[in-house]
Structure formats: structure tokens, C-alpha cells
Amino acid sequence: MSRLIDEIKKYKEAFKIKAPQEVQDKMLEATKKLEDSSISKHALTVGFQAKDFNLSNAIGNEVSLSKTLEENDFAVVSFYRGVWCAYCNFELKALQGINEELKQLGAKLIAISPQSPDASMTTKEKNELEFEVLSDNENKIAKEYGLVFSLAEELRPIYLSFGIDIPASNKDDSYEIPMPATYVINKNKEIIFSFIDEDYTKRCEPQDILEAIKKNS
């Protein structure tokens, strides 16, 4: 069992112990509704051309997919919900764990969320990330990738009770967030690997990313 799966399993077990059952039931029901809606069917996946982007990083410098692919053989793009999401933090730390190997394979790692640059900086510092963390204002790029949905209204007060204020984090009152997704994109901007799941507790295994790149090198 990988370290990422281990971390997620441990966190979920702890959450089941401490969270009220009513809260757990509402969260599970919302995830089930999202899965039943099959919104992931509308997302870009393997074989599609990746949408270009030009987004600000945590210190305000712009990073583009085109420029990244001019300088690297592959781009690994991870869409995440925000620093407030424990599962996202587990995943980002796991990605940091393979960052050096990705560089050796000619791949550049980029993470994207709808958070403001300040929140992106918090993400970068909290998780000690050495790769780019970009701000996708109003989920403009995530929408082009077909990943965006609105957080269920019944979950909003629950999230606030956890101290999670999505509008404040995103500087946007829409409550729109992306499904977590991971893409490996080659020099031709073709998506050669993708992981997308409506269940935000399920995340891409870092080893799968490495294997996809090695297979296409």
C-alpha cells in the first residue's frame, strides 16, 4: 500500500471517529449525488488536447502551459480544491515526494486551484512545495477542462463549522470548486494520462504518473 493511500485511509478513519454521524451522512450523500451526476464524463481525458493557460503563481509571476512545454518534455498538472482540503494536502505532499524524479524524466510539475495568490502561498509554505502553485481565478481554466461544480448547499454550513470559508479563500462567492484531477501532457499538448474522480477522497497515485511518463518517453 502506498504512502498516499495510507495517509488518506488513516485520515478517513480518524474523521469517522470524531465527526458527528449526521455530518458524515450528509457529506457521503453529497459525494454520491456528484458521482451519480457523472460530471467527470465531461472532463478532458486521455487523447484530448490540453487547454493552454497563463496563470499567476504564489508570488504573482505568470506561468503558461505552452512555455512549460517548450522547456520540458512533459507537464504534470494537478487541479486541487484548496489548502483547506486535507486530501489535497496529502496529495500535494506526495507529489513533492516525486518532484525530483519528475525533473529527471523531463517533466515539470504544476498545481492549480481557484484560491487567491495569498492562499496559494499558504499552500506552498504549509506543504513545503518546490513546484509551481497557480491561482485559477473563478475556475476559468478548470472549467475549460470540464472539472468544475458548485459545492452542495447543505455542505456549506458544515464546511464553515470546520473553519473552511471557500468564498474567502477563492475571493469568489460562487462556491465553485474543481474535481481533483491529474494530467500528464506531452510536448504536443496531448493528454497522455489522466485521473479524475467525483469522490474527492480518491487521489492519483504518484507512481502512476511516473509510469505514464516512462511509458511515453
Annotated model-derived regions:
Residues S66-L95:
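Short active-site neighborhood of thiol/selenol oxidoreductases, capturing the structured segment around
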Residues E91-E144:
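Structural microenvironment flanking redox-active thiols in thiol-disulfide oxidoreductases
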Residues K33-L44, Q49-D52, D165-Y183:
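Alpha-helix-centered segments that form part of catalytic cores
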Residues D136-K202:
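Thiol/selenol-based redox catalytic cores and closely related redox-interacting motifs
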Residues S38, E132-L134, K140, A212-S217:
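Non-catalytic interaction/Regulatory regions outside core domains
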Residues I59-G60, N188:
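Residue-level recognition of short loop/turn positions
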Residues E198-N216:
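A short, polar/charged loop-to-alpha-helix boundary motif
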Residues M1-K51:
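N-terminal targeting signals for export/organelle localization
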